[in-house]
UniProtKB/Swiss-Prot annotation:
SUPFAM superfamilies: Taf5 N-terminal domain-like (SSF160897), WD40 repeat-like (SSF50978). The modification Phosphoserine is found at residue 256. Component of the 1.8 MDa SAGA (Spt-Ada-Gcn5 acetyltransferase) complex, which is composed of 19 subunits tra1, spt7, taf5, ngg1/ada3, sgf73, spt20, spt8, taf12, taf6, hfi1/ada1, ubp8, gcn5, ada2, spt3, sgf29, taf10, taf9, sgf11 and sus1. One of its GO terms (cellular component) is transcription factor TFIID complex. It is found in: Nucleus. The C-terminal WD40 motifs are required for its incorporation into TFIID and function in SAGA. It comes from Schizosaccharomyces pombe (strain 972 / ATCC 24843). This is SAGA complex/transcription factor TFIID complex subunit Taf5. CDD domains: TAF5_NTD2 (cd08044), WD40 (cd00200). Functions as a component of both the DNA-binding general transcription initiation factor complex TFIID and the transcription coactivator SAGA complex. Binding of TFIID to a promoter (with or without TATA element) is the initial step in pre-initiation complex (PIC) formation. Belongs to the WD repeat TAF5 family. SMART domains: LisH, WD40. The keyword Phosphoprotein applies.
Length: 643
C-alpha cells in the first residue's frame, strides 16, 4: 500500500525548488519557498497581516542589520549591500506617509551605517521633510524611478531568503515588499565576492539607469587604437622627417633617435582595433597640420622617460595670487605658451607664459596691467576653457548655457553655440580640432563641430549633472563624468553609450584617457581615483591619497604615470601599472612626500588617512589648491594653483 503512495508534499517542493534553481527562476523560487514555509498560509495573507506602522520600519531595519552583522565573514560583505537601499526606501516611505518625526528619528539612528560609502546621497536625503519633497527631489526620484542593482552569489541569496521567510511576521514582509518594488538582485555563479577595500562599492552595484542598457553597453565592441593618418599627409610628414634626419645625421651633439623611425613606431597600422578613416568625418588636412605633426614627433623623441624605474615627473607650478575666490578654471595651451582662466565675473583672462611675452599680439580687447588680456562676451560665470590643438582658437563655457569660440590671434568672440538648457560646466576640444564636446547641468553632453551652431549629437543617459568631459585620443569616443557617480563612454558616430563605469560613491569631478587609448582614470569629490580598462569596462584598481576634491588628472605620454591635483593642495604622481593588492600604508611611508612648513602645520594634515602603494610622490603647495595639471608633449608636468 505504501509503495503505491505518491511523493510527499515536502519532496515535491524540494524537486520543484531544485528545478527552479537550475533554470535561474529566482523570483518564482522565492515565492514557492514562502508558500512552503507558511504551513498552509499563503504569502499574500502573511504580507497583508503586517501593518506598516512608523515603528515597524525601525524594528525591521534593526533586525536585518543585526542579522547581517552576526553573519559569517564569508557572506557579510555581500549581505551588507542590501542595507543601504533598504535604509533609503524605508526613510522615503516614512516621509511619503507624512511621518516626519519617525523618519527623522530613523535617519538619525541609522545614517552612520552608510556615510562611508554613500555620504553624498545620505546628506542629500536629510533635507527632505514632506511627501512633496520626495516627489520633487532629484536624489529621491533617482531611487524611486530606478531599481537598485545588487549582485549576490547563490548561497548569499539563499541565506537572505531563509532569513526573510523565517521573519515574515516579524518585519520580514516589509523588506520583501521593498526588495520587490525597488531592488533588482542578480544571482551570479561562484563564491561570495569580497571587496579588498571597504570604502569602494562594487562596480556593478547601484543605480546607473536601466539594467539592460548597462549590460548591453559593456558588451559592445570598441575601437581603441589610433585612427590611421591620411595617406597623403603621412607621405608628406615622412618626407619632412627624413629631411630632418639627413640634416642632423652628422651632428655629434644630436642624441635624439631617428625621427622617421619614431614616427613609424607611433603610427604602426592596427586595422583590427582602430576606427576607419571615414568613421569620423574630418576636414582635409592643411599645412599647419603637417607642421604640427612634425613638431609632435620631435617632442616625442626628446621626451623625458617617466616611471618607477626611470625618473619621477618634474612639476612646474604657476600660482595665481589675489584671485579672491573668483577664478573657476584654468587651462594650458597645447604648446605650453598660454594660460586661459575663467572667472565669476563672466570674463576670460589670457596670459602668455613665454619669457618674451610676445605670444599675445596687440588687440582691441581689454589689456590688464599684468600683461593679460580680458575676453568679454559671456553673461554668466565662466566654468571651462580649452585650446584647439593648433593653438589658434579657444573655447569657453558658462552659466549662460552657451559655449563660445574665440580667436587667439584677434582676441575676439567668433561664434556662440547655444543648445543646452542649463549652465555648461565643461568643454573639451577633440584631438583633431574640428569637433568639441560640452557637459551641462541639463544632464546631457553634446557634440559640436566648429562650423555648425547646433549640436551634432546629444548624449543623454546620465541621471544628474554632467560635470566633466574629454575625448578619446582617436576622436571616435567621448568620455563624461557625472554627479550621478558614474562615467560613460559615448560613440561619436552613433551617439550611444558603449561603456558605463560604476563604482564611485561621490560625484565624479575629473576624467582622463591615457594616450594609448586603452586606460582611463576618474576622480571624485572624496579624493579617490579609479583606474579602468576601457575595453572590458572593469575597474583595474583604486588609488588613495588625496583628502578632498580632485580637480584635474593627466597621463604621461607613455601612459605609465598619472598626475592629479586637487583641493588638498597637493600634486600627486601615481604608478599606473603597479597593483594595489597589498594593504594600504601610512602616507608618510609611501613614495616621496615634499612638504613645506606651512603645510605640515595646517589643520587638514593632522587627519589620519591611508595612501595606496602606487603613489610615487606627493608635492605640497603653500596652502593653494591645484586647479589644473597637464603633461607637455615632452613629459614635463605643468600645474596651476590659486590663492
Amino acid at each position: 500500500m505504501s509503495a503505491t503512495n505518491g511523493p510527499q508534499p515536502q519532496d515535491l517542493n524540494r524537486i520543484v525548488l531544485d528545478y527552479l534553481a537550475k533554470k535561474g527562476y529566482s523570483r518564482t523560487e522565492a515565492m514557492l519557498r514562502l508558500e512552503a514555509s507558511g504551513s498552509g498560509v499563503s504569502v499574500e495573507e502573511k504580507l497583508k497581516s503586517i501593518e506598516e506602522t512608523p515603528d515597524a520600519y525601525t524594528h525591521t531595519y534593526t533586525i536585518l542589520r543585526d542579522w547581517v552583522d552576526s553573519s559569517l565573514e564569508l557572506y557579510k560583505a555581500e549581505l551588507h549591500r542590501i542595507l543601504f537601499p533598504i535604509f533609503v526606501h524605508s526613510y522615503l516611505n516614512l516621509l511619503s506617509q507624512d511621518h516626519y518625526e519617525a523618519a527623522k528619528q530613523f535617519y538619525e539612528l541609522f545614517k552612520d551605517d552608510h556615510t562611508d560609502l554613500h555620504d553624498f546621497d545620505v546628506k542629500n536625503l536629510k533635507s527632505l521633510s514632506l511627501p512633496s519633497h520626495v516627489a520633487e527631489d532629484r536624489t529621491a526620484q533617482q531611487y524611486r524611478q530606478n531599481k537598485y542593482q545588487l549582485h549576490f552569489s547563490r548561497i548569499t541569496f539563499d541565506l537572505l531568503l531563509h532569513f526573510l521567510f523565517e521573519n515574515v511576521s516579524n518585519g520580514g514582509s516589509i523588506i520583501i515588499k521593498l526588495i520587490n518594488q525597488h531592488i533588482d538582485i542578480h544571482i551570479v555563479p561562484g563564491r561570495p565576492t569580497v571587496l579588498e577595500n571597504a570604502k569602494v562599492i562594487n562596480e556593478q552595484e547601484g543605480i546607473t539607469g536601466q539594467s539592460f542598457e548597462r549590460g548591453d553597453a559593456q558588451l559592445q565592441p570598441v575601437k581603441l587604437q589610433q585612427m590611421p593618418m591620411d595617406k597623403e599627409m603621412e607621405k608628406i610628414v615622412e618626407m619632412d622627417l627624413e629631411e630632418e634626419d639627413m640634416m642632423h645625421q652628422n651632428d655629434p651633439n644630436n642624441q635624439s633617435p631617428k625621427l622617421l623611425k619614431e614616427f613609424r613606431k607611433l603610427h604602426e597600422p592596427n586595422a583590427e582595433d582602430a576606427p576607419s578613416r571615414d568613421y569620423i568625418p574630418l576636414p582635409p588636412h592643411k599645412g599647419v597640420d603637417i607642421l604640427s605633426e612634425v613638431e609632435a614627433v620631435k617632442d616625442w623623441s626628446k621626451r623625458l622617460h617617466l616611471g618607477p624605474r626611470a625618473s619621477l615627473p618634474s612639476v612646474c607650478m604657476y600660482t595665481f595670487h589675489h584671485t579672491n575666490n573668483n577664478m573657476n578654471c584654468a587651462e594650458f595651451s597645447p604648446d605650453s605658451t598660454m594660460i586661459a582662466c575663467g572667472f565669476q565675473e563672466s570674463y576670460i583672462r589670457l596670459w602668455s607664459i613665454k619669457a618674451d611675452k610676445k605670444s599675445l599680439p596687440k588687440s582691441t580687447s581689454v589689456e590688464d596691467s599684468d600683461g593679460s588680456v580680458r575676453l568679454l562676451s559671456h553673461s554668466g560665470p565662466v566654468y571651462g576653457t580649452t585650446f584647439s590643438p593648433d593653438n589658434k582658437y579657444l573655447l569657453s563655457c558658462s552659466e549662460d548655457a552657451s559655449a563660445r569660440l574665440w580667436s587667439v590671434d584677434t582676441k575676439t568672440a567668433l561664434v556662440a553655440y547655444k543648445g543646452h538648457t542649463g549652465p555648461v560646466w565643461d568643454v573639451a576640444f577633440g584631438p583633431f580640432g574640428h569637433y568639441f564636446a560640452t557637459a551641462s547641468h541639463d544632464q546631457t553632453a553634446q557634440l559640436w563641430s566648429c562650423d555648425h551652431i547646433y549640436p551634432l549629437r546629444v548624449f543623454a543617459g546620465h541621471l544628474s549633472d554632467v560635470d566633466c568631459v574629454t575625448f578619446h585620443p582617436n576622436s571616435a569616443y567621448v568620455l563624461t563624468g557625472s554627479s550621478d557617480k558614474t562615467c560613460r563612454l559615448w560613440d561619436v558616430h552613433r551617439g550611444h553609450s558603449v561603456r558605463v563605469f560604476n563604482g564611485h560613491t561621490q560625484p565624479v569631478t575629473a576624467v582622463a584617457i591615457a594616450p594609448d587609448g586603452h586606460t582611463m582614470a576618474s576622480a571624485d569629490s572624496e579624493g579617490l581615483i579609479h583606474l579602468w580598462d576601457i575595453g572590458t569596462g572593469r575597474r583595474i584598481k583604486t588609488m588613495r591619497g588625496h583628502r578632498g576634491n580632485i580637480y584635474s588628472l593627466s597621463f604621461s605620454r607613455e601612459s605609465t604615470v598619472l598626475v592629479s591635483g586637487g583641493s588638498d593642495c597637493t600634486v600627486r604622481a601615481w604608478d599606473v601599472f603597479k597593483t594595489n593588492y597589498n594593504n594600504p600604508v601610512s602616507s608618510s611611508l609611501t613614495g616621496s612626500v615634499v612638504t613645506p612648513f606651512s603645510a605640515k602645520t595646517s589643520t587638514f594634515n593632522e587627519v589620519n588617512w591611508s595612501t595606496s602603494p602606487d603613489q610615487m610622490v606627493a608635492l605640497y603647495t603653500k596652502q593653494t589648491p591645484i586647479f589644473n595639471v597637464s603633461f607637455t608633449r615632452r613629459n614635463l608636468c605643468l600645474a596651476i594653483s590659486v590663492s
